[in-house]
């Protein structure tokens, strides 16, 4: 039964460190690709998944009176704030004051804005695309954290709900975001509900976050509360999920293949699975003759 124990056996509990009652900022990035949500709906209702996520957000807010939450939607062609709303008129219009008067106002505000925002994004999509603007969402999340931390003392972390696979063209901007989060000591946690993503797996490993693969989406809330609810200060004393084998291979920009050996552009660092005359990203021309000689030696 040792594997079911949550607390570490020999954890040195530093009372002075953990007594620091610093509030926490949780920035959530929701994959809002409609095609991915449609695929997930065959296993579990979309309303059930979103309800579990909003319950998790409310639990974070309830844990400390100064805890804060921000929610961004990573759509197929844009990134949008769901909470807090950047448009005051949208905030007033979408939060119904007559609903459940006994509910804590901030809980109701988060629920209404997140659910209505996701519904609006999915219903407004008229084309099917298997991509998501994860690099743009990470950039905006880091910018928001930097803005908030300049005014308040907070422990910040990012949580990504992933349903769509990697987009090869976003490799470099995603890696730039990972290095920025690593420098700022901001963990990137990933809850992979559907599909697989090498980029985000590497992001969690590089920033000291948690990469959690959800095998049964019907129990999403239990996954979230048991594995992703504690902040980085408490995780030192818990047996949190770890990544035994992290796949550090890159994806080629031309055919989106996972490579063991590839060809890298010396200018923009784009990766290709075969020799090319010029780089399709920065249009740099390569000297093919010396390269072909090296390949045959």
Curated annotation (Swiss-Prot):
InterPro entries: TFIIH_Tfb4/GTF2H3 (IPR004600), vWFA_dom_sf (IPR036465). It comes from the Eukaryota. Keywords: DNA damage, DNA repair, Metal-binding, Nucleus, Transcription, Transcription regulation, Zinc, Zinc-finger. It is found in: Nucleus. Pfam families: Tfb4. The keyword Zinc applies. Its main location: nucleus. One of its GO terms (cellular component) is transcription factor TFIIH holo complex. A zinc finger (C4-type) spans 265-282. Gene3D superfamilies: von Willebrand factor, type A domain. The keyword Transcription regulation applies. Belongs to the TFB4 family. Component of the general transcription and DNA repair factor IIH (TFIIH) core complex, which is involved in general and transcription-coupled nucleotide excision repair (NER) of damaged DNA and, when complexed to TFIIK, in RNA transcription by RNA polymerase II. In NER, TFIIH acts by opening DNA around the lesion to allow the excision of the damaged oligonucleotide and its replacement by a new DNA fragment. In transcription, TFIIH has an essential role in transcription initiation. Component of the 7-subunit TFIIH core complex composed of XPB/ptr8, XPD/rad15, ssl1, tfb1, tfb2, tfb4 and tfb5, which is active in NER. The core complex associates with the 3-subunit CTD-kinase module TFIIK composed of mcs2/cyclin H, mcs6/cdk7 and pmh1/tfb3 to form the 10-subunit holoenzyme (holo-TFIIH) active in transcription. This is General transcription and DNA repair factor IIH subunit tfb4. The lineage of its organism: Eukaryota, Fungi, Dikarya, Ascomycota, Taphrinomycotina. The gene is tfb4.
């Amino acid at each position: 039964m040792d594997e079911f124990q949550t607390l570490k056996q020999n954890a040195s509990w530093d009372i002075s460190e953990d007594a620091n009652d610093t509030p926490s900022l949780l920035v959530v990035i929701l994959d809002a690709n409609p095609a991915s949500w449609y695929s997930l709906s065959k296993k579990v209702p979309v309303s059930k998944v979103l309800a579990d996520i909003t319950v998790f957000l409310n639990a974070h807010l309830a844990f400390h009176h100064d805890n804060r939450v921000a929610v961004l939607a990573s759509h197929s062609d844009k990134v949008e704030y769901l909470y807090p709303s950047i448009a005051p008129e949208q905030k007033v219009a979408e939060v119904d004051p007559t609903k459940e008067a006994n509910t804590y106002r901030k809980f109701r505000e988060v629920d209404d804005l997140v659910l209505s925002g996701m519904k609006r994004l999915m219903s407004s999509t008229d084309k099917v695309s298997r991509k998501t603007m994860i690099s743009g969402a990470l950039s905006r999340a880091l910018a928001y954290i930097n803005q908030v931390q300049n005014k308040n003392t907070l422990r910040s972390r990012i949580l990504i709900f992933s349903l769509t696979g990697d987009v090869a063209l976003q490799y470099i901007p995603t890696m730039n975001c990972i290095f920025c989060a690593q420098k700022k000591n901001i963990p990137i946690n990933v809850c992979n509900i559907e599909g697989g993503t090498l980029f985000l797996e590497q992001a969690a490993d590089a920033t000291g976050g948690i990469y959690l693969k959800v095998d049964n989406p019907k129990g999403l809330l239990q996954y979230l509360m048991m594995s992703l609810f504690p902040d980085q200060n408490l995780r030192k004393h818990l047996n949190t999920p770890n990544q035994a084998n992290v796949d550090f291979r890159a994806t080629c920009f031309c055919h989106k293949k996972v490579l063991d050996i590839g060809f890298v552009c010396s200018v923009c660092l784009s990766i290709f699975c075969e020799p090319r005359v010029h780089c399709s990203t920065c249009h740099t021309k390569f000297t093919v003759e010396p390269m072909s000689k090296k390949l045959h030696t």
